[in-house]
Amino acid sequence: MSIILLDPRTINRIAAGEVIECPASVVKELVENSIDAKATAISITIERGGRNLIIVSDNGIGIKKEDMEIAFARHATSKLPDGDLTKVRSLGFRGEGLTSIAAVGKVKMVSKYRDSDTAWLMVFEGGEKTQELTPDALSCGTYIEVRDLFFATPNRLKFLRTEKAEVQSIIDMMNKLAMVNHNVMFSLFVDNKQVFKYLTQQSNIDRLSEIKTLGMEFCKNSLPVNVKEEQIQLSGYIGSPTLSRGKSSLIYTFVNSRPVYDNLLIGAVRYAYSDFIEKDKYPVVVLYLDIPCDQVDANVHPNKSEVRFQDKKLVYRTVVNAIKEVLSINLNTKLKSISEFENDHFVHASMVNSRNIGNSVSSEFFKCFQNRKPLLNNDVQKYSSKNVETDDQSLLDTNVSFCTDSKMITNKLKEERVYENSREHINKGDSKIEVSNFDILGEKKNFVNLANNLLQESPSIDSGKFNTSKKVPSDSLIDTYPLGYALCQIHSRYIISQTQDSIVIIDQHAAHERLTYEYMKQVMAKEGIKRQILLIPEIIEMNNHLDLELLVEYKEKLLKLGLLIEPLGNLSVIVREVPALFGSFDVKSLIINIVDSIMEVGDTLFLDDKIKDICGTIACYSSIRSGRKLKIEEMNAILRNMENTAHSGQCNHGRPTYVELNLVEIDRLFSRR
């Protein structure tokens, strides 16, 4: 058969197959055009999931009469006047949207240009113009009506999902566009019922509070992000680890005001949260990246939902560092667990509150202790809290930051009194932590001793201050410590402590698990990761010279992480030493995954993740268990270590380690207020 040129109608229908995949694609193209037209109010109407009818109307600048017909021509656009793809700031630029919609549906468009006195009507069916340009009535902007979608390509109808599923796709897509355009009012009607109406807002967080999938729960449990790294501006909001979900659909990323789903960004977000949530969980995040147009390529796919970054490593590092920094500061927010508690039938929502206790201990409090040695170090007295100095670029970052809580310490005099009281207890103590035989990096079996080492740091029992025979501790002691003084243990699982104006309920296993994990990170960051020499070095054949060059380039960093490799010639490398923590594992698979990680994000993150996973598992199994009875001294040892430990608000799986109930709120429970 001879080769022939396809007719324009067939060409447009083929092209429409990529651009218009479903009704949500139609809505996306039309709404993006409205946003590019500077509309401040956009209305969408849907019938039967978009199969029968889609209407999008706006109050934008409209289309000139002379441009009405050419707007439906293939690759016709007003958004690339000089044809420079490195300067694309608009959502649309390919000139395929209207052409593709008209090729598969029946389209009626009415538009009035802002300086014109008359609106004009244009009608297309199956890619053919069926009515000449005629005057029509419209106050402003553009009105587009699409009926009988895919009537010209009936095979596509077979692959559409149920009406409810298609409507949900439209809602999800509209939510994304609304998140990044808070100054635009959006309304959606489905089968004559209004689904939502988002009013014009002053800020992104106000808009996020309107969106049902996020709502006030996210706003109350999120932390703001705002950093600039070289030419990248990153802003947005990151959810508390306790808001984690089982899928990544609530990780919203926007690049230059364009909603995108990018594996690099998703991976960066997950890595930043890896110390706080389970491996199979995803955080709730909304991030806005503003990057120079010449450093990002949006012309990857016709639906424009994918991008390519010129400097992937810079983007990845910016996202990871920004999220980690905010999580380390860990501002006071409301815990998801408390939100669930409020929904209980006997508790009014306003009666219970909590701090996200990740590090809700005042930074001012810990300034008093910055000259002391780190917890659990050899020959260190009880309650010392100087941070281990580490390389802040290390992926095993142990930088400890604390937020300032005015409720904790109200003035400088109180800080000094707290310091003097704490120093008095420390100086009077005569017991030291015995961990000289605890080789955290040598043999994994020794990790099981960490629980006992932690609990052996019991406070000095002098002057009756920590005397378990006293039923009620002194007010000065309660006032001294932000997490209070332990009173009892219930069900051999939870510690109850009393502060000056609240009670604190601590999950002993979750809290101790975080203490163990953070200690392991400190030791590894300070002393390095102990390596194990392979009895028989393993030779790995690389696929190509690029893979080999990448491994050689990152050789020194891999050595710091416990992996000693050397080039052997041709395409081979020899692995002589591996991290001792790993035990028995597939060396070749590890090397391949490391290379993939380097190629994807320019870093050895796969190896870092594997080390973190092993440390997390060891921390979980070596920590005190639920059901173990503790002495008052042991309970207080846990509390003091929590106050001095980063990220102690959540265990390694993202669960809260404690909740705090204010006395005022408890009084309300009993109708005392």
From Swiss-Prot:
It holds the Pfam family HATPase_c_3. Belongs to the DNA mismatch repair MutL/HexB family. One of its GO terms (molecular function) is mismatched DNA binding. Transmembrane segments: none annotated. Keywords: DNA damage, DNA repair. The keyword Electron transport does not apply. It comes from Ehrlichia chaffeensis (strain ATCC CRL-10679 / Arkansas). GO terms for cellular component: mismatch repair complex. One of its GO terms (biological process) is mismatch repair. This is DNA mismatch repair protein MutL. SMART domains: DNA_mis_repair, MutL_C. InterPro entries: DNA_mismatch_repair_CS, DNA_mismatch_repair_MutL, DNA_mismatch_S5_2-like, HATPase_C_sf, MutL/Mlh/PMS, MutL/Mlh/Pms-like, MutL_C, MutL_C_dimsub. HAMAP family: DNA_mis_repair. This protein is involved in the repair of mismatches in DNA. It is required for dam-dependent methyl-directed DNA mismatch repair. May act as a 'molecular matchmaker', a protein that promotes the formation of a stable complex between two or more DNA-binding proteins in an ATP-dependent manner without itself being part of a final effector complex. SUPFAM superfamilies: ATPase domain of HSP90 chaperone/DNA topoisomerase II/histidine kinase, DNA mismatch repair protein MutL, Ribosomal protein S5 domain 2-like. NCBIfam families: mutl, PRK00095.2-2.
